[in-house]
């Protein structure tokens, strides 16, 4: 079957980038270019009981799977629809009990294998790009990444051998490599992780640090909307990474995860880098070497914190945030992205500890520089306004709360579309207060 065109869009060969997606007609800011159902998706373990395992709907009073008591559903329809995939895990979770711990990548890959068996022909998620056409970048993997794939394959065999037929070992290596660079994480309106999925047609889009579209989720459906004016013949670009950081950091991340260096306008001009790594205005300004050392320290502390999250207590994590901010503030302005990173982490710890005043204090410092560093329509900025609005509302400051929530809505109406359930929920929060 030939890849059919999606309305007003075509697959093409993009110079120096391989395959890409191109517009055949104009799209205006806020227009939906296309939507793509998940080829396969899996709800993250931590959200069980809060979201339906099948459609990812967030609601109270979900029904529990009677066998494993771990999966929750809206109703019998969702449970029935999910059964061919849930059965891969249901009895295994009961048998292994506490020892059932496949990674999310393994869980998603198991579902892809099951889907390929059940539905060998092309699916509605693959109008322009089929899963089997995904890039694997196998030749570029370092030993650490290869080892990770081997341990994922071992876990796949350990937890899924009863209900799945596996292809040969080398095909599994390719599949895991494909999932690693083509998978998506589904996030909610506050950018909390909900699950992982494969959206083949969305994966066709190439990356830019000044993207002209944004990807959002409605349940397990991915939606792609314009955040800049798009003209016929323009390539459609999304962003694969968090755009907060300076050019060198962004490209380190892109090379590590996706094996390319970006050459977009932002990366060639480095226009925003100076403001992103803002240095304190002192009568005796820091020397270039002191700045370089502090940037190195900042990158190290970000990595150290990422690892510490898995084993340190909230109060220890907060201490890392506070000490690192204190050290960096001798050279960096508060609007510096490395300072903002640690403030954001500190805010997250405060939210976890239900220290609402502490979280609000950090959020208030973050929001203005965020709005400057990120593109105009940014989910990071929208989710920060949303968190601030909800904190104000919870602390009985209705005027500030309403103002912040309306700022979030203004961005989300473009990024998520005016009819998104998240937006009606937020409007409801404003009215009910």
Curated annotation (Swiss-Prot):
It is found in: Cytoplasm, Cytosol; Nucleus. Its EC number is 2.1.1.-, 2.1.1.354. A zinc finger (MYND-type) spans 52-90. Zn(2+) 1 binds at residues 52, 55, 74, 78. S-adenosyl-L-methionine binds at residues 17-19, 137, 206-207, 258-260. It catalyses: L-lysyl(4)-[histone H3] + 3 S-adenosyl-L-methionine = N(6),N(6),N(6)-trimethyl-L-lysyl(4)-[histone H3] + 3 S-adenosyl-L-homocysteine + 3 H(+); L-lysyl-[protein] + S-adenosyl-L-methionine = N(6)-methyl-L-lysyl-[protein] + S-adenosyl-L-homocysteine + H(+). The keyword Lipoprotein does not apply. Zn(2+) 2 binds at residues 65, 68, 86, 90. The keyword Methyltransferase applies. Its main location: cytoplasm. Coiled coil: none annotated. SUPFAM superfamilies: SET domain (SSF82199), TPR-like (SSF48452). Keywords: Chromatin regulator, Cytoplasm, Metal-binding, Methyltransferase, Nucleus, Phosphoprotein, S-adenosyl-L-methionine, Transcription, Transcription regulation, Transferase, Zinc, Zinc-finger. Residues 7-241 form the SET domain. One of its GO terms (cellular component) is cytoplasm. Signal peptide: none annotated. The modification Phosphoserine is found at residue 283. Belongs to the class V-like SAM-binding methyltransferase superfamily. Protein-lysine N-methyltransferase that methylates both histones and non-histone proteins, including p53/TP53 and RB1. Specifically trimethylates histone H3 'Lys-4' (H3K4me3) in vivo. The activity requires interaction with HSP90alpha. Shows even higher methyltransferase activity on p53/TP53. Monomethylates 'Lys-370' of p53/TP53, leading to decreased DNA-binding activity and subsequent transcriptional regulation activity of p53/TP53. Monomethylates RB1 at 'Lys-860'. Interacts with RNA polymerase II and HELZ. Interacts with SIN3A and HDAC1. Interacts (via MYND-type zinc finger) with EPB41L3. Interacts (via SET domain) with p53/TP53. Interacts with RB1 and HSP90AA1. This is N-lysine methyltransferase SMYD2.
